[in-house]
Amino acid sequence: MAKTAAQPKTMESNHKVASVLSTGLFAILCVLIAFPLLAGFFASFQEGREVVMKGMSLNLDFSKMHLDNYKYLFSGNEDSRKYFMWYKNSLILTLITVVLTLLVCYFIAYGLTMYKFKLQGFLFFLVIATMCVPFEILMLPLYNEVTSLGIINTRAGVILPGLCGASTIFFFKQYTQSLPKELLDAGRIDGCTEYGISVKIMMPITKPAFASMAILCAMGSWNNMLWPMLVFRDTSKFTLQIGLNTLLTPYGNNYNLLIAGSMFGILPILIIYLIFQRYLIDGMTSGAVKG
């Protein structure tokens, strides 16, 4: 009887210990993630040479902080015009990539989930298998293919190779599996076409999945630097990440524009997250559990 009474107390004690450990680990991770962002943010209000000499830290001297870096960023001089040209290129490329990737991956996942056909499982296996292949292995064949198609130095050359993302297809497939198949039959009875069912009935239901993937796709496209650097040749087509990298030269570095421009470059992703954050958790949890 004493053992039975002591068992719940032991389980409760273990649960408290686990809760404290997990909370502490989470707090440490938050500090590690937040430190570079906070240090970079405060560094953007300091002289670039001072940041390079002393390094970025949270040991701040507010008397030396100023807005000169951001004034230079918005001054309209040659460096400022280049920066916002790269900024515009990144915005356009990210918008096109997100829209096309979501639509293509949704229809692929929808077809793999809602219809039965030969080699269905094998095709899905091939999709998942590509997740195990590092991009660096595919980079040279993709570059040769883009060159042979004549789309080098174009946005199409950057967008098309990554249009059918395996992880995005997998997420959409897991989400659509949780949707009731009776909706398809109801749509067919009402005379709706297969395309109409997928667009007018099923697509609105998958709004949380679209929002979740929009955030992840936007982050991936906005931060992508390696592949656009290989494809683009003209500086007028550079994205923000490539353009900022050109500010680092053996002959001198424009740290004022680099630091302030890096901080200002976070803004689009932050706005996208704030817009779609309420759908993010719903999309992740609904897609992870088949109802």
List each model region and its residues.
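ABC-family P-loop ATPase nucleotide-binding domain
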Residues: 1-8
